[in-house]
Amino acid sequence: MKIVVIGTNHAGIATANTLLEQYPGHEIVMIDRNSNMSYLGCGTAIWVGRQIEKPDELFYAKAEDFEAKGVKILTETEVSEIDFANKKVYAKTKSDDEIIEAYDKLVLATGSRPIIPNLPGKDLKGIHFLKLFQEGQAIDAEFAKEKVKRIAVIGAGYIGTEIAEAAKRRGKEVLLFDAENTSLASYYDEEFAKGMDENLAQHGIELHFGELAKEFKANEEGYVSQIVTNKATYDVDLVINCIGFTANSALASDKLATFKNGAIKVDKHQQSSDPDVYAVGDVATIYSNALQDFTYIALASNAVRSGIVAGHNIGGKELESVGVQGSNGISIFGYNMTSTGLSVKAAKKLGLEVSFSDFEDKQKAWFLHENNDSVKIRIVYETKSRRIIGAQLASKSEIIAGNINMFSLAIQEKKTIDELALLDLFFLPHFNSPYNYMTVAALNAK
Amino acid sequence: MKIVVIGTNHAGIATANTLLEQYPGHEIVMIDRNSNMSYLGCGTAIWVGRQIEKPDELFYAKAEDFEAKGVKILTETEVSEIDFANKKVYAKTKSDDEIIEAYDKLVLATGSRPIIPNLPGKDLKGIHFLKLFQEGQAIDAEFAKEKVKRIAVIGAGYIGTEIAEAAKRRGKEVLLFDAENTSLASYYDEEFAKGMDENLAQHGIELHFGELAKEFKANEEGYVSQIVTNKATYDVDLVINCIGFTANSALASDKLATFKNGAIKVDKHQQSSDPDVYAVGDVATIYSNALQDFTYIALASNAVRSGIVAGHNIGGKELESVGVQGSNGISIFGYNMTSTGLSVKAAKKLGLEVSFSDFEDKQKAWFLHENNDSVKIRIVYETKSRRIIGAQLASKSEIIAGNINMFSLAIQEKKTIDELALLDLFFLPHFNSPYNYMTVAALNAK
């Protein structure tokens, strides 16, 4: 069987590796317009903020690896068209050579692309996006310039908040804008996001929330020099747009069933409306166990797993995704937040009737006074069924990075908050309290 | 209704508090021969090893708290007999006053007692056990003596290993004995326990494993001065017996159905063979989801939860325990180990046919070279059903203290190792890798 994979980042790599390792013997062709693969975008802010010196280790696979496994890999090759009826992919190499690859099975792993705010001045020099390695390099080069002092970051989601931290670590003045009233609004309720806002402000990042960018203005050299919002005008030397991503599905969105944001609709086998076409990673929808429905959640962790599922199904073993909870985490200047499932706000937006239980305690036993950070927890649950649909944790302790994985499984398994109260969570003073804050938050649920 | 609770430590307190908070109006009598309550025994080594200065904060409840809630609480009062037929408890106060308390419902929360090795010289001065606060005080006083230099700890389970660390932190020479070939043998397989052995040895603790104590010898003042094993004789100034605990069920073991170690047999409502008698905490059996059967696991975390379950059932709300996995953790000189369910060795001893998948990786993304400890993981699963029945984690990273809670839930929910491979575990370089070591260990399972 011949399998063509368009897109060689996390999802495409996971699909190809699953096929190569578990179902050897298939002919695999991988195509990507980029020159590099497996770039860990979430490492950009760590590198650009000089928490690590170089970007070299932000990759985990390269074309030669796949060539060595017998894969035909075409980098810097742009797919121009897919003929779904005749099962052919048309592409052009860097040197304009025409490529036609027939397929038995096609895998769309084209990921997502940054949303471009359609504002006057959007194409000025000095306005950047942040997804690809090359975009990270461009921003790193800008940060190196002495004259680039004031940086506006538009969008205080994960990417925006992280690159704002990086800019501050590089000694820049940083203005962080968002239309929402807090940072991280899509993953956390205000009571939690405010903790990150305070952390950002304490570290000298200027917050401009509830504020909408209207226009970018240029200096004489055509470089962005001002950002105009619905509230004021600010002098800036650089703008980084981080208002979000959308599915990069143009190649197929007119032929295959798509979600409201253009993402390719798939079932739990990652199969699209065309049985010979699979879609994986950020280009595809995904089943949310919190929502109990398909939705769109662009995360590298989902990309990897969806690739594994597609690889098995294409390889011949029927395997359903167990669905996801949108588990995520962020660490800014040592302040950590993790969440999974839906926030109260997100749940209400989706019409779910929910309640929540909040609690705050020290991570470790109260009698340990050193290195014992406080932890805020919120458990969100359906009021009637009491099924857990979300959890948020915030602390300087890293242990919350493990505990959120338990909540992710609890949502997947449709556990109620009352069942969670009885879950066997171990106790050792070095790590937690006899009445673990997760147990107490669950016990306290009205 | 009148409810008598015998034993006022974690399980008894949880039962009483559940009744008081959720089902007010019952008459509650609490009886305990001890003068203190709610002592966190797992804090003893932390206090005696001077990681904290004083024991004052190792308690979370006192008799007056319960008196204020209308409870009749009799401390330093020893129950001599229970007349199950006539539902009466006979006890004697410190001043030898006779107490008779009739009950509608009785709760046995008498905990566990240290196993005393029946060896010549077992009653010599300078031979200690470690369960109660008073026993912690006695050991602390011994550690303060200049002349007490060489300390033998018999039994390298959790309590023995922790008090060995404490003795070393107090500058003592420490000899740690165990009949097994490693420390922590009941919770960890050798490949994992060896990591703790190396850690103990590196910190100067003399390990004597695969060695059985035979006799204790005394000096002229009747103080223990030598320990004789099946291999050699050792001069010591103090012996701390930590060979384990057994259910403290003498008051009822001849009248109620008991487990092979004398623990009171209970169902998932914590009800004993006598419908008016409940048993909670270390005196009772408990349902193990790993084993899919009742067994005996003496842990404070189980004690708390079993008390909550009993309180609800007595109060009138039918509630089944969700069972436990025996989740546990230990941290010795900053080396952390957590486990849940059964080790390979424990599973095989119980006749289960199991396989396991091991993996080792850094906790955080590979490109973070600071504060990024390696983590060893073992997932144990039934060979045929591939149901996960155990997990072991070892690292200097504290994040394993959260991750083990996910495995505890996975065992409770009978997840297979293949389902675990697809679980939504988030990725952020600050906390983990794109291919999380838990995902990889599950993917690698043969």
Swiss-Prot record, chains A, B:
A single Gene Ontology molecular function, please?
NADH dehydrogenase (ubiquinone) activity
The effect of pH on activity is described as: Optimum pH is 6.0-9.0. Below pH 6.0 the enzyme is reversibly inactivated, above pH 10.0 the enzyme is irreversibly inactivated.
Q: Does the keyword Acetylation apply?
A: no
Please report a single Pfam family linked to this protein: Pyr_redox_dim
Q: Which residues bind FAD?
A: 7-11, 32, 42, 79, 109-112, 131, 158, 282, 299-301, 427
Keywords, in A-Z order: FAD, Flavoprotein, NAD, Oxidation, Oxidoreductase, Redox-active center
- Required cofactors, per record? FAD
User: Which positions bear Cysteine sulfinic acid (-SO2H)?
Assistant: C42
Enzyme class, broadest EC rank: oxidoreductase
Q: What regulation of activity is recorded for this protein?
A: Inhibited by hydrogen peroxide, sulfhydryl reagents and quinine, but not by EDTA.
Q: How does this chain assemble?
A: Homodimer.
> Family assignment?
Belongs to the class-III pyridine nucleotide-disulfide oxidoreductase family.
According to its UniProt entry, the function of this protein is described as:
Catalyzes the four-electron reduction of molecular oxygen to water. Active on beta-NADH, but not on alpha-NADH, beta-NADPH or alpha-NADPH. Under aerobic conditions, oxygen acts as the electron acceptor. Under anaerobic conditions, DCIP and MB can replace oxygen as the electron acceptor.
| Protein name, entry field | NADH oxidase
